[in-house]
Amino acid sequence: MSEETPASSADAPVPPKKRGVPEGLWLKCPGCGSSVYKKEVEQRLNVCPKCDHHFYVSAKDRIAQVLDEGTFEPMGESLRPVDPLEFSDRRKYADRLVGEQKRTGLTDAAMTGVGMIRARRVAFAVTDSAFIMGSMGSVVGERLTRLIERATDDGLPLIIISASGGGARMHEGILSLMQMAKVSAALARYDESGGLFISVLTNPTMGGVAASFASLGDLVFAEPKALIGFAGPRTIKATIGIELPEGFQTSEFLLEHGYVDRIVTRKNLKSEIARAIDYCGK
């Protein structure tokens, strides 16, 4: 009687592959902690279907959400950031710019231009926190200034949606800080001409952006639960050693204290802007 030959690994039955859920179909909401279907969130303008948390939205998507389809005429696209200080921290600023441009598809942290909102012609700008935290350097400041001057010359309502957690861009030193004054001065001339400036604050709006143009609107709208302020809560506590009220930099707190005029959900933003333009006779 012959001995049995042990089965080789090649002869062993192959267990069926587990059919897992493809990656990227679900998101975890930072507002309520629920797992939510990504496609459903996108259909609701990147808002959680369970708690109405407002997720990040890119500058390009903001344009698609707020402006009438196909009406956006970009301005200042030829302007490109440079590295006049040859700045370097963990990475050379010049290399960082190239990396951010490839990653986001943007040339800098702001998109500006002219478009229509419910058939009303407006000057429109939006910053994007994905590009170096939406910080304001020379190009962002110049694009905004040229847009404001265009709005002044053409008598257009001005809409700026801010999503800037980085404030003035430290990589450009004083050249970025001066943009705060330059943009604010352009807004002062626009105001003297009788223009209507609607500033929309989203999460986050911080630093030099919050301390300049974002706070200068004739009307200041904010998305729900947006973080708005100059320095972050931990920085303030470490600097002055005082425990500040919980949520003191949220849009709801700022509405109660008169800094924000109205909290507007994303789905209502377009209609609220159009209504404000009509109400103000612009």
Regions inferred by a protein language model and the residue ranges of each:
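N-terminal alpha-helical interaction blocks
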Residues: 1-17
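N-terminal targeting/trafficking signals and adjacent low-complexity tails
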Residues: 19-22
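Residues immediately within or flanking Cys/His clusters that coordinate Zn2+
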Residues: 26, 45
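Short cysteine-rich clusters marking metal-coordination/redox-active sites
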Residues: 29-32, 48-51
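Cys/His-rich microdomains that often coordinate metals
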Residues: 35-36, 54-55
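Long, charge-rich boundary regions
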Residues: 56-134
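Cleft-lining beta-strand/loop regions that shape enzyme active-site pockets
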Residues: 108-191, 198
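Conserved catalytic cores of soluble enzyme domains
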Residues: 165-281
